[in-house]
């Protein structure tokens, strides 16, 4: 069993190149996999490993980056290691939006999962899913709307169209995208902006299914693909043709072929591409029979 730990922290960081090397070396030493993104504005990461190794790694990360606690964190379990390798990346922003976040100037507008239902049940509240469309399609909250933007940098264009007097309840996977979006709205003069504390993952971990207003599963950016209530690994897999999530229902379509295509990409792939993907899948299947992992195998479950 592996622990999966997601976290972020907005704090001015320096010596990024030096810290990248220190972090990378320690991840390798402790056999921790996943991705850590560092920028001048802070850190955003999801990493996974055995419990004791992960615990010491978390302590080491705080020491290297010089802070005592994270702004937000979540932990879940996985029967398999959901990441291929350890990666530490230096970026201009931990979440690309063209907006630098200063936590000192930010209001405390986080809504606890236990109070979230009451807020989004209010018909006057705009329930805003700040994730990408394909994530929204896997699962979302009751009454939510999605901006339908290709990347987060386009999000401000959508936000500019909203009424400043309308209460807005935003949510995303772990909370970090909403941190930036809420700062943007506050700077634009919006007064009633709220965000789900700890994001969807925190909600699914703490709210029982019978009390939940969440429909579907939550897409995650690792080889679990999706999680359900209790942060149990979900039922989705990933299409090798287009890298979009595929549900058990999608797999019943004639357009679905394991390792080749799904309902999202079948009509857009050329015959040459499909033949290439079939050959790749054949190699993966042969590797599985011998108990080894093929270089092109993207999923572990």
UniProtKB/Swiss-Prot annotation:
Database matches in HAMAP family: TrhO (MF_00469)
Residues in Rhodanese domain copies: 121-212
Record SUPFAM superfamilies: Rhodanese/Cell cycle control phosphatase (SSF52821)
GO terms, biological process: tRNA modification
InterPro entries per UniProt: Rhodanese-like_dom, Rhodanese-like_dom_sf, TrhO, TRHO_N
Enzyme Commission no: 1.14.-.-
Record: active site: 172 (cysteine persulfide intermediate)
Keyword annotations: Oxidoreductase, tRNA processing
Catalytic activity: uridine(34) in tRNA + AH2 + O2 = 5-hydroxyuridine(34) in tRNA + A + H2O
Species of origin: Pelagibacter ubique (strain HTCC1062)
GO molecular-function term, one example from the UniProt record: oxidoreductase activity, acting on paired donors, with incorporation or reduction of molecular oxygen
Gene: trhO
Family membership: Belongs to the TrhO family.
Identification of the protein by name: tRNA uridine(34) hydroxylase
Alphabetical list of PANTHER family matching this protein: RHODANESE-LIKE DOMAIN-CONTAINING PROTEIN 7-RELATED, THIOSULFATE SULFURTRANSFERASE/RHODANESE-LIKE DOMAIN-CONTAINING PROTEIN 2
Function: Catalyzes oxygen-dependent 5-hydroxyuridine (ho5U) modification at position 34 in tRNAs.
Database matches in Pfam families: Rhodanese, UPF0176_N
Domain of life (superkingdom): Bacteria
